[in-house]
């Protein structure tokens, strides 16, 4: 059983739990199936939330951009 839980879309907004990947968080109402800004919370483990997405701790070159 995986620790990763799926993202749930409610009222056009994405709700992410634990370390679900942003690629799994696709709301039907969002353009081209992309994650909405409310999905910034679905960062991979070791990442911190930023205004324009998620940036990994440690390696500056390793970005986890959830909201690009």
From Swiss-Prot:
Where is a divalent metal cation 2 annotated to bind? 9, 14, 16, 27
Keyword tags: Metal-binding, Metal-thiolate cluster
**Residues noted as binding a divalent metal cation 6 in the record, renumbered to the chain:** 43, 47, 50, 67
Q: Name one GO molecular function term.
A: metal ion binding
User: Where is a divalent metal cation 7 bound in this sequence?
Assistant: 56, 64, 66-67
Binding of a divalent metal cation 3 occurs at 16, 20, 25, 35
Residue numbers binding a divalent metal cation 5: 40, 42-43, 56
Q: Which InterPro entries match?
A: Metalthion_dom_sf, Metalthion_dom_sf_vert, Metalthion_vert
Q: Where does a divalent metal cation 4 bind?
A: 39-40, 50, 54
The record's Pfam families line, in alphabetical order, gives: Metallothio
Where is a divalent metal cation 1 bound in this sequence?
A: 7, 9, 22, 25
Keyword Metal-binding listed:
yes
User: What does the similarity note say?
Assistant: Belongs to the metallothionein superfamily. Type 1 family.
Domain notes per entry: Class I metallothioneins contain 2 metal-binding domains: four divalent ions are chelated within cluster A of the alpha domain and are coordinated via cysteinyl thiolate bridges to 11 cysteine ligands. Cluster B, the corresponding region within the beta domain, can ligate three divalent ions to 9 cysteines.
What does the UniProt record say this protein does?
A: Metallothioneins have a high content of cysteine residues that bind various heavy metals.
What is the designated name of this protein? Metallothionein
Source taxonomy: Eukaryota, Metazoa, Chordata, Craniata, Vertebrata
Q: Which gene encodes it?
A: mt
């Amino acid at each position: 059983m995986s620790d990763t839980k799926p993202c749930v879309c409610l009222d056009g907004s994405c709700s992410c739990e634990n370390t679900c990947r942003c690629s799994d968080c696709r709301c039907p109402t969002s353009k081209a199936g992309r994650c909405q800004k409310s999905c910034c919370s679905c960062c991979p483990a070791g990442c911190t939330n930023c205004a324009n997405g998620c940036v990994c701790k440690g390696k500056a070159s390793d970005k986890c951009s959830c909201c690009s």
